[in-house]
């Protein structure tokens, strides 16, 4: 069984430990138009979703969490493509579309899991070049642009570039020291 984590008063519930209601809630968040718009595939069926969660039980390099704070579900965060030898992984977030905020709380908890619990050296992420809100969010949280995948995503008969961002443990530690 995969482990759940806590960061301050935030619970990170591993997808493999979700109850049936939480599984449906995650699917509702994921398929919400405001979330699906920025995903590589726009709609996920219940059958596909449940199979994905089942497959995660045998996938040590992919961790997905539902984040909860004081009974409120904030959204989902993931660390995927984890390479424990080279100590890096890919970060992903989608917040509860019915809440105004929550992304920053999820990000801080995910970074804690990645850098403190998993002892990773760096986190990487992909964001569509036209997702200005996400780009501003990650840059505000000290993620640095490291590259571009040209014409990587096909959406509405158009090819869109994907921007690559990263933060390493030094950037995480520097940011943590600023808050003391």
Curated annotation (Swiss-Prot):
MF annotations from Gene Ontology: acyltransferase activity, transferring groups other than amino-acyl groups
Enzyme class name: transferase
Catalytic reaction annotation: UDP-4-amino-4,6-dideoxy-N-acetyl-beta-L-altrosamine + acetyl-CoA = UDP-2,4-diacetamido-2,4,6-trideoxy-beta-L-altrose + CoA + H(+)
Enzyme Commission number: 2.3.1.202
Claim: Repressor is one of the keywords in the record: no
InterPro entries linked to this entry: Acyl_CoA_acyltransferase, GNAT_dom, PseH
Pfam family, one: Acetyltransf_1
Domain N-acetyltransferase: 13-169
Keywords, sorted A to Z: Acyltransferase, Transferase
Purpose: Catalyzes the third step in the biosynthesis of pseudaminic acid, a sialic-acid-like sugar that is used to modify flagellin. Mediates N-4 acetylation of UDP-4-amino-4,6-dideoxy-beta-L-AltNAc to form UDP-2,4-diacetamido-2,4,6-trideoxy-beta-L-altropyranose.
Protein name stated in the entry: UDP-4-amino-4,6-dideoxy-N-acetyl-beta-L-altrosamine N-acetyltransferase
């Amino acid at each position: 069984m995969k482990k759940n984590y806590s960061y301050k008063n935030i619970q990170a519930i591993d997808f493999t430990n979700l109850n049936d209601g939480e599984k449906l809630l995650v699917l509702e968040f994921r398929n919400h138009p405001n979330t699906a718009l920025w995903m590589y595939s726009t709609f996920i069926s219940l059958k596909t979703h449940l199979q994905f969660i089942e497959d995660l039980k045998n996938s040590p390099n992919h961790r997905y969490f539902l984040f909860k704070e004081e009974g409120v579900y904030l959204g989902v965060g993931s660390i995927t493509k984890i390479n424990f030898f080279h100590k890096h992984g890919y970060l992903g977030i989608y917040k509860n579309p019915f809440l105004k905020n929550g992304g920053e709380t999820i990000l801080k908890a995910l970074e804690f899991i990645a850098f403190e619990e998993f002892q990773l050296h760096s986190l990487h992420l992909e964001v569509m070049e036209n997702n200005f809100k996400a780009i501003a969010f990650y840059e505000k949280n000290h993620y640095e642009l490291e590259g571009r995948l040209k014409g990587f995503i096909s959406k509405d008969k158009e090819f869109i570039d994907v921007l690559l961002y990263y933060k390493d443990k030094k950037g995480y530690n520097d940011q943590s020291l600023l808050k003391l």
